[in-house]
């Protein structure tokens, strides 16, 4: 008689570089189940502190275990030199999450290589990465943009979480340590929001094939999380998820949506229906919405909603990226007109992305307030508000960056 086989989806979460390894440490700490953790780093000392199931110290000859020095080229070379080892630990995976903090050397340079290997082995490959805080310096911001663009080419789906947006949902007294912990928590939510749909038996159950149908070759994805208690809690949590400050754009036009609703045993059918309806109205009319509901008595009277939207026309929602700061307000109104007014109302958050230009060259800093408070005649000038994206490519001013030996 044939031995019984394990038909569970094999999910592996790979933390690449310092930020990625910190993120999987957080996932292990909170007890994320049903996945295997792999830590990959050029910093041998940081690897020693990880609780991952598998640890790969790559670039031993290249860096002697001392890190990549915030140089993505070093991180990339280290990964290529150990390609066979990485292939070995990824074999047999149905789904691979590549998580990293973009902007440094190891995560930025190595994540695309790891993703390329995972995808070549036939695994559904999802990147979940953070964009660095503004205070981490221009060099990291520029390296992060290059790394994100490169990673997008190697994964099925890419979720980018801008760390600066965490400040908009944090207390002004938040410490730097807590800010980075918040970033780890959001990376956890991104991975958990997907894996729980597959690994946790639910009231309305989903499987790996459901998730794959939405996320395979989906391009950029947006993730929103929300929780609420009291009256209309499910709708409030869903509203919070689709208008989350973490979203870089609106989910309008998403052709694939993963929706997970978790609540206690008192979670009502009509509550679920109302929350799901709210999300479906925000997505494309013909969107493939994969929906799951999990009963977790540990939540008490709290309802949690996780929304992951993908499958945008063109692979990503680029039209909104320049107006991302107004995305929260835009969702409930017309997509084009309110973008300018909401950018005004969220000026404090917007300032985060404009700090470096203001320090280096006062000239761009002057028009910035003018555009925000200006008349509609200045409207057309608003979209080319791309300074944070890539005007610093050739600059060598790195005084804001952290010294390489600390990486």
UniProtKB/Swiss-Prot annotation:
Described purpose of this protein according to its UniProt entry: Essential cell division protein that forms a contractile ring structure (Z ring) at the future cell division site. The regulation of the ring assembly controls the timing and the location of cell division. One of the functions of the FtsZ ring is to recruit other cell division proteins to the septum to produce a new cell wall between the dividing cells. Binds GTP and shows GTPase activity.
Subcellular location: Cytoplasm
Source organism of this protein record: Streptomyces griseus
One term of GO molecular function: GTP binding
Residues that bind GTP: 18-22, 105-107, 136, 140, 184
A Pfam family per the record: FtsZ_C
Highest rank taxon of the organism: Bacteria
Residue numbers spanned by region Disordered: 312-407
Protein name: Cell division protein FtsZ
Ranges of compositional bias, category Low complexity: 336-348, 368-377
Compositionally biased residues, Acidic residues: 396-407
Gene3D superfamilies xrefs: Tubulin/FtsZ, C-terminal domain, Tubulin/FtsZ, GTPase domain
UniProt similarity note: Belongs to the FtsZ family.
Keywords: Cell cycle, Cell division, Cytoplasm, GTP-binding, Nucleotide-binding, Septation
Biased composition (Pro residues): 381-390
GO cellular component annotations of the record: cell division site; cytoplasm
Complex and partners: Homodimer. Polymerizes to form a dynamic ring structure in a strictly GTP-dependent manner. Interacts directly with several other division proteins.
GO biological process terms held by the UniProt record: division septum assembly; FtsZ-dependent cytokinesis; protein polymerization
InterPro entries reported for this sequence: Cell_div_FtsZ (IPR000158), Cell_div_FtsZ_CS (IPR020805), FtsZ/CetZ (IPR045061), FtsZ_C (IPR024757), Tub_FtsZ_C (IPR008280), Tubulin/FtsZ-like_C (IPR037103), Tubulin/FtsZ_2-layer-sand-dom (IPR018316), Tubulin/FtsZ_GTPase_sf (IPR036525)
């Amino acid at each position: 008689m044939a031995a019984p086989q394990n038909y569970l989806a094999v999910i592996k979460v790979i933390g690449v570089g310092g930020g990625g390894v910190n993120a999987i440490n957080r996932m292990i700490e909170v007890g994320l189940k049903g996945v295997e953790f792999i830590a990959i780093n050029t910093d041998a000392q940081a690897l020693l502190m990880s609780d991952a199931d598998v640890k790969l110290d790559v670039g031993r000859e290249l860096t002697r275990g001392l890190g990549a020095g915030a140089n993505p080229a070093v991180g990339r070379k280290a990964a290529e030199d150990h390609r066979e080892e990485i292939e070995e630990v990824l074999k047999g995976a149905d789904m691979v999450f590549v998580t990293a903090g973009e902007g440094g050397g190891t995560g930025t340079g190595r994540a695309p290589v790891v993703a390329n290997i995972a995808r070549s082995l036939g695994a559904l490959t999802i990147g979940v990465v953070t964009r660095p805080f503004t205070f981490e310096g221009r060099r990291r911001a520029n390296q992060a943009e290059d790394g994100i663009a490169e990673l997008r080419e190697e994964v099925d789906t890419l979720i980018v979480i801008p760390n600066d947006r965490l400040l908009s949902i944090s207390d002004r007294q938040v410490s730097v340590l807590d800010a980075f912990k918040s970033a780890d928590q959001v990376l956890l939510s991104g991975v958990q929001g997907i894996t729980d749909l597959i690994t946790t038996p639910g009231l309305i159950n989903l499987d790996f094939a459901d998730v794959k149908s939405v996320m395979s070759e989906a391009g950029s994805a947006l993730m929103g999380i929300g929780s609420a208690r009291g009256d209309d809690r499910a709708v409030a949590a869903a509203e919070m998820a689709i208008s989350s400050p973490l979203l870089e754009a609106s989910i309008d036009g998403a052709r694939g949506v993963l929706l997970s609703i978790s609540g206690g045993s008192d979670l009502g059918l009509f509550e679920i229906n109302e929350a799901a309806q709210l999300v479906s109205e925000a997505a494309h009319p013909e969107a493939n919405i994969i929906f799951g509901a999990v009963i977790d008595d540990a939540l008490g009277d709290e309802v949690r909603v996780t929304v992951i939207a993908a499958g945008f026309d063109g692979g990503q929602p680029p039209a909104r990226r320049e107006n991302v700061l107004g995305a929260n307000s835009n969702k409930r109104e017309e997509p084009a007109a309110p973008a300018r007014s909401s950018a005004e109302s969220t000026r404090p958050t917007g300032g985060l992305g404009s700090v470096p230009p203001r320090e280096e060259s006062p000239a761009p800093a002057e028009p910035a307030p003018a555009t925000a408070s200006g008349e509609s005649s200045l409207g057309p000038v608003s979209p080319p508000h791309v300074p944070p994206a890539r005007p610093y490519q050739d600059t060598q001013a790195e005084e804001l960056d952290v010294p390489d030996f600390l990486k």
